[in-house]
């Protein structure tokens, strides 16, 4: 994982709600597809899924991307202190009481893998229509996907 979290336009943050490394690998593939920087919660770091230098929160980085996508992130105060100034906060979680939903601009109460597969399919399909050049979605295209 490379890239500067502070300079990122789009951050895909992985939380314990991803449940396992297979789902984490899906998140990595989606991040690559949409040109997002990968980050994680303290729980994801403690599980060894994400390096400590990619943690967002009180004991990690404070970021202000155009879009923050929380995948299986519950949204403890320690975490939200590091990302609450994102321009758009998109939260994907099956728990309707997840604290992150209180600050999210877009709330998706659904299985995170289902949403990630749809996201990857949408933008991979656009790439197959333009085989000569890889199309990475703009911030507006990503927001349009989530606003449906």
Protein language model features and the residues they cover:
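N-terminal glycine-rich FAD/FM-binding segment characteristic of electron-transfer flavoproteins
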Residues: 1-148
